[in-house]
Amino acid sequence: VIADTYLLLCPLSTMGLSAVESRKQGDVCFFIRRHFAGKNLDEPLVMFGDIAVPTGLQNADPCVTRGCLWPKATDGNVYVPFRIANSFSQRQRTTIIEGLRSFAASTCIRFTPLNRQRDFVDIQSLSGCFSFVGRRGRGQVVSLSRQGCVFRQIIQHELLHALGFNHEQTRSDRDQNVRILLENVISGMESNFRKIQTMNLGTPYDYNSVMHYGRFAFSKNRQPTIVPIPNANVAIGRATQMSPIDILRVNRLYRCSTYLLKQNFCPTSWPLPQ
């Protein structure tokens, strides 16, 4: 049996507050799961904070091929079928649907109710907040625990994972923008701060990204684990919704030409997965 330990990771400024209270102050907190050896594979292994992988033998690799993207329809939109479990309250269900619909306002992503499609996002309330990165095929779980995950910024965060995006602080150029203080990280959690080869889509590092961890993520001693450079006082991990750069990346990755033109960006001037 897999034994799970749950950690609610929040910035120091919100220590002692409930998850709901801290979110009202604009901080994003995550329920993180640590797995120990066992054979219960009913739920996927969760690595790197909130990224799901099918087994402990696989890495949460970046979405670097066209095969991990959701297909584009002839009308230029990307339709991502979804199913929401019945375990959510009506209010929570409404919040989730609003989060799904938020993508349609500024990107060509259209989350649509499941109608017998093979591949879809299966939104459930499991152990914490987590998602696979990119399209996995068939029903892929996005977990939004009823106890702490049904908030707009967290919904968008996990859906961005499902669309193919990783955490901001794992960017290949992150060392020019943040300093990682591993000496303050909980033992065994250092992998959450690994740097990976990412497609940055011609966009700058974004401290305001909804995909960015907070300053005290995984801290073992109430000291910072991520410090912006050169200005250490820049706010990170406090996004309440997708930033303009988050939106730009979605539009670039999925070639949302109409929306790129609205943002005054050329739709064909950056490298994309093959």
Residue map of PLM features:
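Zinc-dependent metalloendopeptidases
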Residues: 2-274
